[in-house]
Regions:
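Feature responds to low-complexity, polar/acidic, surface-exposed segments characteristic
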Residues: 3-22, 26-51, 57-78, 86-119, ...
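Preference for long, well-ordered alpha-helical segments
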Residues: 148-151
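Alpha-helix C-terminal capping/helix-coil junction sites
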Residues: 56-57, 127
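IQ-motif-like calmodulin-binding regions
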Residues: 81
Length: 164
């Protein structure tokens, strides 16, 4: 599901691009890569075009506006949570969170107010089913997510969905 970075290394503390995430989540769900040409900044010739196309057409990833995906952009913790929550829904998990449950779940973290409004419910869902670790003191929603964190999130999601 997750390829190394060459020469037998995984580089767990390296950040991840949006393109890398689209590839990993598509492979994790066993979806076939198919370029949909949905974004003007994703050339068909790039290795990630099919993964981004499939992840987008499956409702897992969105663009960043103006028909762009920003494939080389670094993915943040709140973006990853939103995308993993969408993938979890495809796996059959109930990702619905009402406003009160969302606030209760996020309020335990010192920086919960810094989570973007669009990311609050998916972030709360990820914490509620232990896709994300509740023992952290802060969410750090705009911090770049690390390869090791994505690997753990996807493992936890697939486990919660009883797919592994």
């Amino acid at each position: 599901i997750i390829n190394g970075m060459g020469k037998g290394t995984f580089m767990p503390n390296k950040t991840m691009t949006r393109a890398e995430f689209a590839a990993i989540v598509t492979r994790a769900l066993g979806l076939a890569a198919k370029d949909t040409k949905a974004f003007t900044d994703v050339p068909s010739s790039k290795w990630y075009a099919g993964y981004i196309g499939t992840a987008n057409s499956s409702g897992i990833v969105n663009g960043v506006g103006s028909s762009k995906f920003n494939p080389d952009g670094t993915i943040t913790r709140q973006e990853a949570a939103a995308m993993v929550a969408r993938a979890a829904k495809l796996c059959g998990l109930d990702t619905a969170m009402d406003a009160a449950a969302t606030k209760d779940m996020l309020a335990q973290f010192g920086d919960y107010r810094s989570v973007a409004s669009w990311a609050k419910k998916p972030m709360a869902f990820c914490y509620s089913v232990n896709i994300l670790d509740q023992s952290d003191l802060n969410i750090e929603p705009t911090k770049a997510i690390l390869r090791c964190e994505i690997a753990q999130m996807l493992y936890n999601m697939l486990s919660a969905a009883e797919l592994i």
